[in-house]
């Protein structure tokens, strides 16, 4: 048993050595093939270049010069040509103008470029050319408000021209006496709207006038003016008052 085991071990070691040697020889052969291919490739390129130099020599009548001299001259010419082509490419890229849809055959590109540069450097200069309107103070005079609104009407849409009336009252078919700042202690509290009737007595008119003058002095606000009524308006007011008085009052 021991002899057989040793024999198998020796056989296994021999196989490993053989496999290792085979791998080494295979890698060497592979490297040799790669080197030969590289050498052949370089040699073929060199032969091809010398063949071109020979044709170039014959075409230009340089029979008195060797192939090495011709290759040197060709290499210099190629270098100069490559350099001049790169310079021409740079010049053409500098002269190339960007296309703009609003320009006709690129005639306005200089102006557009200058205006865009100005906007980038100082963007506020573009806003300085726009029409500027000073905002109107809420406490300014009525003339200034009217002039501003008239100028605003010409340049703004219709829905911006509406101004809520603060100082005018609607016209009614009868006279109104309105105290807008009446408080709980005011004699007109609870009856802010007073309809003047033709049947009122002189005493009530006198009391109402005294109360109104007292309120005007205390509040120092302009009292709304009364509009004159026509005969038809007076008749309509009388009919309304008659209807109101004819309604039955609730007894306590």
From Swiss-Prot:
Compositionally biased region (Basic and acidic residues): 1-15
Subcellular localization(s) per the UniProt record: Cytoplasm; Nucleus
Any GO molecular function: transcription corepressor activity
Coiled coil regions in record: none
Cysteines engaged in disulfide bonds, as pairs: none
GO biological-process terms attached to the record: G1/S transition of mitotic cell cycle; meiotic cell cycle; negative regulation of transcription by RNA polymerase II
CC annotations in GO: cytoplasm; cytosol; nucleus
Predominant subcellular localization, coarse grouping: cytoplasm
One of the Pfam families matching this protein, by short name: Whi5
Keywords for this protein: Cytoplasm, Meiosis, Nucleus, Repressor, Transcription, Transcription regulation
Disordered, as annotated region: 1-23, 84-110
Highest taxon, organism lineage: Eukaryota
InterPro entries linked to this entry: Srl3/Whi5, TF_Nrm1/Whi5
Biological role stated in the UniProt entry: Has a role in meiosis.
Family the entry assigns: Belongs to the WHI5/NRM1 family.
Name the UniProt record assigns to this protein: Cell cycle transcriptional repressor whi5
Organism, scientific name: Schizosaccharomyces pombe (strain 972 / ATCC 24843) (Fission yeast)
């Amino acid at each position: 048993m021991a002899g057989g085991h040793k024999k198998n071990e020796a056989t296994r070691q021999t196989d490993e050595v053989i496999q290792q040697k085979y791998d080494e020889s295979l890698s060497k052969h592979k490297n040799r093939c790669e080197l030969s291919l590289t050498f052949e490739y370089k040699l073929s390129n060199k032969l091809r270049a010398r063949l071109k130099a020979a044709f170039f020599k014959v075409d230009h009548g340089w029979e008195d010069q060797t192939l090495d001299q011709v290759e040197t001259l060709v290499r210099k010419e190629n270098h100069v040509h490559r350099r001049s082509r790169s310079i021409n490419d740079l010049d053409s890229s500098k002269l190339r103008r960007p296309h703009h849809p609003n320009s006709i055959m690129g005639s306005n590109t200089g102006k557009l470029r200058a205006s865009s540069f100005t906007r980038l450097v100082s963007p506020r200069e573009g806003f300085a050319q726009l029409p500027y309107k000073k905002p109107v103070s809420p406490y300014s005079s009525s003339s200034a408000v009217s002039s501003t609104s008239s100028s605003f009407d010409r340049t703004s849409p219709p829905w911006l021209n509406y101004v809520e009336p603060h100082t005018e009252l609607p016209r009614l078919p009868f006279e109104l006496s309105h105290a807008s700042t009446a408080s709980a202690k005011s004699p007109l509290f609870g009856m802010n709207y007073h309809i003047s009737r033709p049947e009122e007595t002189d005493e009530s008119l006198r009391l109402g006038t005294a109360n109104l003058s007292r309120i005007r002095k205390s509040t120092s606000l302009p009292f709304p003016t009364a509009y004159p009524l026509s005969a038809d308006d007076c008749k309509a007011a009388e009919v309304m008052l008659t209807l109101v008085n004819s309604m039955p009052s609730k007894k306590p």
